[in-house]
Amino acid sequence: MTKPRLKIIPLGGLNEIGKNMMLMEYENDIIVIDAGHMFPEEEMLGIDLVIPDISYLLERRGKIRGIIITHGHDDHTGALPYILPQLNVPVYCTRLTKGLISVKLKEHKALSEASLKTIPPGGKFTLGKFRIEFFPVCHSIPDAVGLVINTPIGTIVHSGDFKVDYTPVSGKPTDLSRLAQLGTKGVLLLMADSTYAELAGYTPSEQVVGENLDNVMANAPGRVIITTFSSLISRIQQVIDAAAKHQRRVFIVGRSMMNTTQMALKLGYLNDPKGILARLDQLKGMPRNRIVFVTTGSQGEPTSALVRMANRDHRQLHILHGDTVVISATPVPGNEGLINRTIDNLFKQGARVLYSKLAQVHVHGHASQEELKLLLNLVKPKFFMPIHGEYRHLSLHAKLAQSVGIPEGNIFVLEDGDILELNPEAGKVTGKITSGNVYVDGLSVGDIGSVVLRNRRMLSRDGIVVVIITINKQTGKLMGRPDIVSRGFVDTREAKDMLEESRDLVARTLDHSGARPTEWSLVNTKVKDVLNKFYYEQTKRRPMVLPFMVQV
């Protein structure tokens, strides 16, 4: 009889940044690790977010014992409002992570039905045949954890997002002693964060950012505007501390930033002992050199507070000449264009802008190469699987693992949807499941597919031509010349002759086709074909051609 194997299947987070989601399956038990979203790429027109395809989980809903969240960043929690109502399983996380998830679920009116279980760092719990332990890791957010997962075939360590920082601003350092203990007992598989596997050396401490923010507030002649991710609680604390030192008041701007700040204050993860935080209605009459704004918009999101300020579109606040704007975040891949446009607009408004290329106003929360090697040497896993990163990150992390003595045959560089099957002696990729992207477009989730995106790209690039064909209902004959309406294709005044010629071309095509009204599909195809060819010959463009038939 074949012994059961442990299946490990990534649903997101491999060969991409964000959308982190992993499942483990043993016999009739499944646990899910993280459920994040990622930002759309530039060609994903009109898409707000991208989340993992959970078809595999929906087909096995009865086997899912829970979702485990390693920390509160959106790339690990952002899919929960969309998938929890479908799966209806409990979520296990630390206290701050629960608070951040609650804010997100409340915004989507999904909180009342959710079951959120709080587990402290160091806590242990059992889900089916899996025994899970949270161990503290240092990241750019408090209450981040890695996972020790005891399975019937051996111990698995999941690093979560981590770095080695001995002087964290808030939260605990990564528990290296626990990792060393695990290494002496024996670890079957290590899955570790690869986001910054390209960078040599060590990741700088978060203290560096605090020192630079302090310097900015000491020297800025006017208002200071700081933008970061709303979930970067430790960064917001650094702003409050620096503002208090320099007699400035802090105003929180942006709905998500406000909600997160209020939650973190309530739970005790943010401290404001000197009453530095203020409301916008207290702003009037305050000297500019006593003002700090903390706002959303670090990724150039079009509807964020900072972008609206940069475009002079914010209802309450505008950029003033002499403002200092600090972008305390690095661009998520795909958002570079949005951020650069925002920076340009801020400069145009007369602001001084500080960002990663000009000042160290942000450090990332991920381990660099020496920290990754330290983790590998402490844990001493039999097998290794790099996670969280694009292919180059995973590949470089795999090379690091080889450099510390893990055999190449024991290292698994997977893609989303790959099925890795493990037993105590060996592991191999045995197949692939349906995985990929589900697009969130406003209120629509999952009904935007590749065809819709292709059409949007076509419209944005080459425009649209609508052909209105009037047909006699009785005879099926064309009545007059077709009308052609163009948008985003050509200047109708300059291309008047070409559009007139295309009207004649459609009329001749229909006269020769002999199509009856019942043969509209044939008419539709013929009109599209002839106009696509004609317009490409004339302009080297391929507008979307939409024929409409009106029967009178």
Regions found by a protein language model. Name each.
Residues 118, 294, 546-550:
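Extended hydrophobic secondary-structure segments that form protein cores and membrane-embedded regions
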Residues 120, 415, 541-545:
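Short Gly/Ser/Thr- and Asp/Glu-enriched loop/turn motifs at secondary-structure junctions
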Residues 198-328, 332-520, 524:
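Hard-cation-handling environments
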Residues 14, 38-42, 63-64, 355-358, ...:
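A glycine- and charged-residue-rich anion-binding loop/surface
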Residues 90, 385, 544-547:
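Short glycine-rich phosphate-binding loop at a beta-alpha junction
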Residues 1-68, 73-285, 304-318, 337-341:
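His/Asp/Glu-rich metal-coordinating catalytic cores
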Residues 105, 401, 535:
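Conserved hydrophobic residues forming the short capping helix/wall of the S-adenosyl-L-methionine
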